[in-house]
């Protein structure tokens, strides 16, 4: 993979990883022209996106750790931990059972379309409730489950699944739902990346990698994800997610058309 292609894929990952539009759906289209992504490459560009969100929320994370004596911080941190543990336990069960849909165009396309419809419904339902900021235990549990659903069904979008299940479960405030979804995603994605990285090294998948290309992709993904998430957090203060939902549906239909005509696997 040449350096320009690595940078382009880093841009795509950075934009799409935390926006509720599915990074998988975009990367599967891109690789038709830019070449197949190795497991190591996928891990590296995702790690860059996770690092960006960690940087954005570092003060919040430090506050949760150092301010554990505060009942509000302690309650919030406990809910983050429970959501993460639910994801981790269910993730191990799913891995053991070997249940995961293939990353091919058709299932990803349907996940995009169904997810877009789900987002429109969630916005409609949330608009009819008071914009509560509270993260309840029900929200924490459902967010933990939603992360696994997103992992099992490529194209769902982890951020989309978690944000909108939080909104439907009672956290009507978009900013609060998004913050909790992103904070839960930090340990979840670090753990998943570490697991996949160890597995890749153990299986010899790192042999022959172009480390310069990996470095470029990592840096680009980090910078672009930082900009994308900062923009998203500002956008949702006064806007709904409806445009993302419409975009998902259009992309899903496009993928179905490309699959039907043989342009994509």
UniProtKB/Swiss-Prot annotation:
The chain crosses the membrane at residues 38-58, 80-100, 107-127, 135-155, 178-198, 216-236, 244-264. Disulfide bonds: none annotated. Pfam families: BacA (PF02673). It is found in: Cell inner membrane. Keywords: Antibiotic resistance, Cell inner membrane, Cell membrane, Cell shape, Cell wall biogenesis/degradation, Hydrolase, Membrane, Peptidoglycan synthesis, Transmembrane, Transmembrane helix. One of its GO terms (cellular component) is plasma membrane. It catalyses: di-trans,octa-cis-undecaprenyl diphosphate + H2O = di-trans,octa-cis-undecaprenyl phosphate + phosphate + H(+). The keyword Transmembrane applies. The keyword Membrane applies. It is a multi-pass membrane protein. Its EC number is 3.6.1.27. One of its GO terms (molecular function) is undecaprenyl-diphosphatase activity. GO terms for biological process: cell wall organization; peptidoglycan biosynthetic process; regulation of cell shape; response to antibiotic. InterPro entries: UppP. Belongs to the UppP family. Bacitracin is thought to be involved in the inhibition of peptidoglycan synthesis by sequestering undecaprenyl diphosphate, thereby reducing the pool of lipid carrier available. Catalyzes the dephosphorylation of undecaprenyl diphosphate (UPP). Confers resistance to bacitracin. This is Undecaprenyl-diphosphatase. It comes from Rhizobium johnstonii (strain DSM 114642 / LMG 32736 / 3841).
